[in-house]
Amino acid sequence: MQNLTVAILAGGKSSRMGQNKALLPLGTMKIIEHLVTNLRPIASELLLVANTDEYAFLNLPVYRDRFPGQGPLAGIETALRVAFNEKVYITACDLPLLPAEIPRFLAENTEDYDVTVLAYKGKIEPLIGIYRKSIYPVVEKHLILRKNKIIDFYPQVKVKIINFEQLPENLQREEFLLNVNTPADYEKLLKIFSLKE
């Protein structure tokens, strides 16, 4: 898509997995490579936010957090600060099955909202969302105040929530939202992936 930055946040500690989940194998590639492959077609700019040099093999720009240790909101701050485009799709490195059509749908339906996020079963998914670069000062201020929860800044901006059921029917598959946080999640991912192949 024209004028869309895609930012993959890969700065987490992967503590529940015991190793870097983004680098776990999935078929012939690593999890993070699947994300990059899926999202590249919709990105006019593609970048990673990570505090490690382990992703050099992807040949993508990698930016480090300005507020290390302050969670995913710090990753959003970095992405908004460095992004070339006004619209920035923020996602996590542990959503390898999410098709690019979902962020494309969100981006096409942002209207004049500052944040457009997906919600599933009543729960907001802040790392499946389009964020406008113009809200950067609000995000930065929250981090300076050590208010690290993403949705805590939502009341200060215009937020549009798109429910899972509002997506086109072919995108309403629960497996697309599988977060790979634990060894059990990884086993589930491998099963789903082997069925797809």
Swiss-Prot record:
Amino-acid positions noted as binding GTP in the UniProt annotation, renumbered to this chain: L9, A10, G11, K21, D65, D94
User: What's the superkingdom here?
Assistant: Bacteria
Recorded E.C. number(s)? Answer: 2.7.7.77
Residues involved in Mg(2+) binding = D94
Which reaction(s) are listed as its catalytic activity? Answer: Mo-molybdopterin + GTP + H(+) = Mo-molybdopterin guanine dinucleotide + diphosphate
Cite the entry's keywords alphabetically: Cytoplasm, GTP-binding, Magnesium, Metal-binding, Molybdenum cofactor biosynthesis, Nucleotide-binding, Transferase
Assigned GO CC terms: cytoplasm
Show the CDD domains listed in the entry: MobA
Q: Which GO terms describe its biological process?
A: Mo-molybdopterin cofactor biosynthetic process
Where would you say this protein principally sits, based on its record? Answer: cytoplasm
Q: Does the keyword Metal-binding apply?
A: yes
Location comes to:
Cytoplasm
GO MF terms, alphabetically ordered = GTP binding; metal ion binding; molybdenum cofactor guanylyltransferase activity
Cofactor(s) needed by this chain: Mg(2+)
A Pfam family that this protein carries is NTP_transf_3
Say which family it is in.
Answer: Belongs to the MobA family.
Q: What is known of its domains?
A: The N-terminal domain determines nucleotide recognition and specific binding, while the C-terminal domain determines the specific binding to the target protein.
Q: What does this protein do?
A: Transfers a GMP moiety from GTP to Mo-molybdopterin (Mo-MPT) cofactor (Moco or molybdenum cofactor) to form Mo-molybdopterin guanine dinucleotide (Mo-MGD) cofactor.
| Protein name, entry field | Probable molybdenum cofactor guanylyltransferase
Organism encoding this protein = Carboxydothermus hydrogenoformans (strain ATCC BAA-161 / DSM 6008 / Z-2901)
The top of its lineage is:
Bacteria, Bacillati, Bacillota, Clostridia, Thermoanaerobacterales
